[in-house]
């Protein structure tokens, strides 16, 4: 049986005018700032007007460690939202925006897939409403103002060897990881080493996604540490006087984007920090607004539960004062096989034994999710190559962990295929079994926070960090930053820092290569192993297959 591509399905969607989608949430036409007919920004006035409403229930969708192609977490998020609406619940979804770089590299789009998509899919995976361009521009403005400050006399006495603020671009470009700037003569400034990160790794992105309003945004931007003086005292963004202009550039980007699913259910798509190099959750302002206008809000956190869900619980929920009522762990038969040692080329063939071996990875994620005090259900995201024997093997394993696994066919059937999952989620939420608590208290020393995550979530034996890193953490504690949560930057493919170490490894070590203080965002980034904050393109990038056809339509984009 042949299936339409995601882009063919999205183009055939029967979209409603965005004003009709907003009306489902109590929004009047004046509450929306339309970008065409099918997407809009939500006004700050509307957001302010619903603050007195009672909060709905929050459901987190996370996953096992992914295969390189991803496991359909966004697809499941969309499918579950549609499924909840199908069974009579007032539900909406909150997901992240797509980064251009990975879309032209190897990752799937950020709009779901099959019959569980958010539309307009093409625009969402490209420029959308321009939020990422605004973030890149605000970040770049600060970069320019730092070098300009140094050029015109360096009143703040910045040590040009200790400029912490790098540049960003929303593209996978390994050639820019490490560069020398200001070459070409005296008129171009003082030459120094710097580099580029991808926009989704920018602290500006993290700040936008954690800020409560424009006032909070401007304060957080001012708190960014951009450099250090020779006496090692920090230079802040506010010392460069950049936070006001940066806020102006981000004014519209702070407003959540409203779009719709294929089944005309509302969706907020806002913000997009990566989960392997940042905190991996959509914006606080979108999630908290959704909770005021819907009874059920389904959101996702990037990559596996060891990264996205851990940061959702320890960073986003802690900072935003929210708590999930249930967690859905997405698993696929093919990922079980890969974690069980099967090569990517052989994933289509039945291999029940490999599925059983790979289930240890799923079991670890279930244990970790439950350790936060939140009830869980496993969603088996169905693929046409899955066999009954393989599916039953997953169900039996999950049952042994005291959790139910539901086969969900939302990719193929939309809400009809996800209704059983939706029913189970409602059962968990209404059962009132959630007693959420983060993994560590604010007052725990920073290095102990790192060890807590490494040992309790990754099941490592030890954290390897040299004296320089440990001393840096102590200095930050003495400077008043010891209460901040830690944001682990590591590979998404394994519980360890080795992407090839599949399954549920124990007894491994977590090497810390670098620590970065994101004072504006409000967390410490802990860079582990070989993770890069600027990805590269694969040998055959997806961009090679993307073009416009004779009708002016995009081809090759999913």
Curated annotation (Swiss-Prot):
EC id: 6.3.4.3
Pfam family, one: FTHFS
SUPFAM superfamilies in the cross-refs: P-loop containing nucleoside triphosphate hydrolases
Any GO BP: tetrahydrofolate interconversion
Pathway membership: One-carbon metabolism; tetrahydrofolate interconversion
Catalytic activity: (6S)-5,6,7,8-tetrahydrofolate + formate + ATP = (6R)-10-formyltetrahydrofolate + ADP + phosphate
The keyword Nucleotide-binding belongs to this UniProt entry's keyword annotation: yes
Top-tier EC class: ligase
Family annotation (InterPro entries): Formate_THF_ligase, Formate_THF_ligase_CS, P-loop_NTPase
Residues where ATP binds: 67-74
Disulfide bonds: none
UniProt key word Nucleotide-binding: yes
GO terms of molecular function: ATP binding; formate-tetrahydrofolate ligase activity
Keywords, sorted A to Z: ATP-binding, Ligase, Nucleotide-binding, One-carbon metabolism
NCBIfam families attached to this UniProt entry: PRK13505.1
Family (UniProt): Belongs to the formate--tetrahydrofolate ligase family.
Name of the protein in its database record: Formate--tetrahydrofolate ligase
Gene name of the encoded protein: fhs
């Amino acid at each position: 049986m042949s299936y339409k591509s995601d882009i063919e399905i999205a183009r055939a969607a029967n979209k409603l005018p965005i004003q009709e989608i907003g009306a489902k949430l109590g929004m009047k036409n004046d509450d929306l700032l339309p970008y065409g007919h099918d997407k809009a920004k939500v006004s700050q006035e509307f957001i302010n007007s619903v603050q007195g409403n009672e909060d709905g229930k929050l459901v987190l969708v996370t996953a096992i460690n992914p295969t390189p192609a991803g496991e359909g977490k966004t697809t499941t998020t969309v499918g579950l939202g549609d499924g909840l609406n199908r069974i009579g619940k007032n539900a909406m979804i909150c997901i992240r925006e797509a980064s251009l770089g990975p879309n032209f590299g190897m990752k799937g789009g950020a709009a779901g897939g099959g019959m569980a998509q958010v539309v307009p899919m093409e625009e969402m995976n490209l420029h959308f409403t321009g939020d990422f361009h605004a973030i890149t521009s605000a970040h770049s403005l600060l970069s320019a103002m730092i070098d300009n400050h140094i050029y015109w006399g360096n009143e703040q006495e910045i040590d040009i060897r200790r400029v912490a603020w790098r540049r960003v671009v929303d593209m996978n470009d390994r050639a820019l990881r490490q560069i020398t700037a200001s070459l070409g003569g005296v008129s171009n400034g003082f030459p120094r080493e710097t580099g580029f990160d991808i926009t989704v790794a920018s602290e500006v992105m993290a700040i936008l996604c954690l800020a409560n309003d424009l006032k909070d945004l401007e304060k957080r931007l001012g708190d960014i540490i951009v450099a250090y003086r020779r006496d090692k005292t920090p230079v802040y963004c506010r010392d460069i006087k950049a936070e006001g202009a940066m806020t102006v550039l981000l004014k519209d980007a702070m407003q959540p984007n409203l779009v719709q699913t294929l089944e005309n259910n509302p969706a907020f798509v806002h913000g997009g920090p990566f989960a392997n190099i940042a905190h991996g959750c959509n914006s606080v302002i979108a999630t908290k607004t959704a909770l005021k206008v819907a009874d059920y809000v389904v959101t996702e956190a990037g990559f596996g539960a060891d990264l996205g869900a851990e940061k959702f619980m320890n960073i986003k929920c802690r900072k935003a004062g929210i708590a999930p009522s249930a967690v859905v762990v997405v698993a696929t038969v093919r990922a079980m096989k890969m974690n069980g040692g099967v090569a990517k080329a052989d994933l289509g063939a039945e291999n029940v034994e490999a599925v059983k071996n790979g289930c240890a990875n799923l079991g670890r994620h279930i244990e970790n999710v439950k350790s936060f005090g939140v009830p869980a259900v496993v969603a088996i995201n169905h693929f046409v190559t899955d066999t009954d024997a393989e599916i039953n093997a997953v169900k039996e394993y999950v049952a042994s962990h005291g959790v139910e696994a539901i086969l969900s066919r939302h990719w193929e059937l939309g809400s009809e295929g996800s209704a059983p999952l939706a029913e189970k989620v409602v059962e968990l939420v209404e059962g009132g079994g959630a007693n959420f608590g983060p993994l560590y208290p604010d007052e725990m020393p920073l290095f102990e926070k790192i060890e807590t995550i490494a040992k309790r979530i990754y099941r490592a034996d030890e954290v390897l960090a040299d004296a320089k890193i440990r001393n840096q953490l102590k200095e930050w504690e003495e400077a008043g930053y010891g209460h901040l949560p830690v944001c682990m930057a590591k590979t998404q493919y394994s519980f360890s820092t080795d992407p090839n170490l599949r399954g549920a490894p124990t007894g491994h070590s977590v090497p810390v290569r670098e620590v970065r203080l994101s004072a504006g965002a409000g967390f410490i980034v802990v860079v582990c192993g070989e993770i890069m904050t600027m990805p590269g393109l694969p040998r055959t990038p997806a961009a090679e297959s993307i073009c416009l056809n004779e009708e002016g339509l995009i081809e090759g984009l999913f």
